[in-house]
């Protein structure tokens, strides 16, 4: 049976080279079908169960449009999460699944409210940092560039335990959301290219495929060099 991967709203959700996550998956899975769902389309996941659902970074205005687009499918998304359908969301896509997003003036954009977090925007101050952490026994590296921090119960569904850098906010070592096969993280890079061990875990353990990573010797060498750099005490986070 052909593997089907749904890429949500690629015309909006490709900031910070996040589209390279999908391009890398295409190289790893040359026989898979990639369904690119535009904003005007009904998502594939409404009637079917894709083998993976992916959405990347977007502008704040696009984020508000996408919340409105997905709100009618909130219960369906919750059902798919409970049924272990693999999902990966990067950068500010994570905020769509929280309770709300708060603007500087205190006004709130209601989100899907699937997880007990909320985000606060600070559009005059972009936050950037490196991050090193772990998911189970996999070491994770990446970059953050964002106008928001997330608060609330960040302990309930943590994805990455942060060793160096900043978690969902400056007071927590938890980064992202992990629930069943739902993974969401603020990290960019692109995430799957920077973290081949997690990509291998996603494809083979979560999606139950049996694949070899594309360009594995090169991408592993780059990962090991970056990990060494991130482990250097002189590296500034």
Question: Which residue stretches match the model-derived regions?
Answer:
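Structural motif
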Residues: 52-56, 88, 184-186
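Pocket-forming structural segment of enzyme catalytic cores
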Residues: 104-175
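Beta-strand-turn-beta hairpins that frame and shape the catalytic cleft
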Residues: 2-3, 136-140, 177-183
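N-terminal beta1-alpha1 cap of cysteine-dependent amidohydrolase-like domains
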Residues: 1-79, 193-196, 200-237
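A glycine-centered loop/beta-turn motif at secondary-structure junctions
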Residues: 169-207
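Cysteine-nucleophile active-site neighborhood
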Residues: 58-134
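Glycine-rich nucleotide phosphate-binding loop and flanking beta-alpha elements
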Residues: 60-61, 94-96, 149-151, 191-193
């Amino acid at each position: 049976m052909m593997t089907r991967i749904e890429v949500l709203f690629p015309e909006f959700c490709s900031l910070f080279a996040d589209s390279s996550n999908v391009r890398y998956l295409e190289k790893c899975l040359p026989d898979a079908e990639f369904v690119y769902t535009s904003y005007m389309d009904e998502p594939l996941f409404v009637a079917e169960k894709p083998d993976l659902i992916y959405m990347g970074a977007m502008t704040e205005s696009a984020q508000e449009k996408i919340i409105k687009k997905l709100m009618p499918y909130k219960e369906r998304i919750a059902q798919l999460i409970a049924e272990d359908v693999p999902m990966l969301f990067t950068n500010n896509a994570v905020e769509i699944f929280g309770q709300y997003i708060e603007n500087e003036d205190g006004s709130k954009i209601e989100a899907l409210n699937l997880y007990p977090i909320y985000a606060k925007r600070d559009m005059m101050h972009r936050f950037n940092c490196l991050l090193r952490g772990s998911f189970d026994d996999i070491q994770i590296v990446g970059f953050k560039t964002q106008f928001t921090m997330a608060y609330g119960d960040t302990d309930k569904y943590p994805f990455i335990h942060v060793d160096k850098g900043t978690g969902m906010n400056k007071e927590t070592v938890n980064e992202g959301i992990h629930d069943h096969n739902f993974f969401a993280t603020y990290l960019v890079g692109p995430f799957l290219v920077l973290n081949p061990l997690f990509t291998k875990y996603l494809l083979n353990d979560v999606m139950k495929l049996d694949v070899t990573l594309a360009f594995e010797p090169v991408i592993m060498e780059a990962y090991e060099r970056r990990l060494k750099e991130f482990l250097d005490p002189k590296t500034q986070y």
